């Protein structure tokens, strides 16, 4: 076989292997008829994502709380590792809910308000928690749920690693935005 043909075949096979199939990760047709929602994360997928997050946390000497929500805000799966205080569990839920409200990562929202006092005041009146650890769960370009992780300084890494392990490629993480030093305006 000519090298160019082998290369083309390898590219086609690799693309097919990395493609996501939404039907593997959402509720069944029967369940979707009852809920009138087709692209909702399945309980099985949510449990696998949670376990992947727990595995990441354990490997990195962390203890976390994890919430996976459906696009309508229903708890599909939740887990609190030993050693979590109530605030960690609550913030994990708030992060997942914030993703549903904003359709974006909580880190991206934190960046948006980092150096803008007016936005900080506006956002403080909304039911959002703009700090790292909440991500949309995206499959085939559709948000099928949200994950919120609380309890450590690598919450977003934990969530992202779990999502990419279980459902495949996800949107890139938001960059870190430097926060201006407090002090008088210049």
Can you describe what each PLM-predicted range is?
Residues 2-10:
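Sec-dependent signal peptide recognition
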Residues 10-19:
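Hydrophobic h-region of N-terminal signal peptides that target proteins for export
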Residues 20-186:
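Flexible, solvent-exposed loop/hinge segments and secondary-structure transition points
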């Amino acid at each position: 076989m000519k090298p160019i043909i082998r290369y083309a075949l390898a590219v086609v096979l690799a693309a097919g292997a990395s493609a996501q199939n939404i039907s593997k990760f959402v509720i069944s047709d029967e369940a979707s008829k009852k809920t009138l929602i087709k692209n909702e994360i399945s309980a099985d997928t949510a449990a696998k994502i949670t376990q992947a997050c727990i595995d990441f946390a354990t490997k990195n000497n962390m203890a976390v709380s994890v919430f996976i929500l459906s696009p309508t805000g229903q708890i599909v799966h939740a887990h609190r590792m030993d050693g979590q205080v109530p605030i960690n569990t609550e913030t994990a839920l708030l992060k997942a809910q914030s993703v549903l409200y904003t359709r974006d990562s909580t880190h991206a929202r934190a960046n948006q308000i980092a150096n803008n006092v007016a936005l900080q005041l506006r956002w403080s009146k909304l039911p959002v928690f703009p700090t790292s650890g909440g991500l949309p769960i995206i499959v085939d370009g559709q948000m099928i749920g949200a994950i919120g992780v609380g309890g450590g300084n690598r919450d977003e890494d934990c969530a992202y690693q779990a999502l990419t392990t279980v459902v495949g490629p996800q949107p890139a993480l938001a960059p870190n935005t430097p926060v201006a030093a407090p002090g008088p305006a210049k």
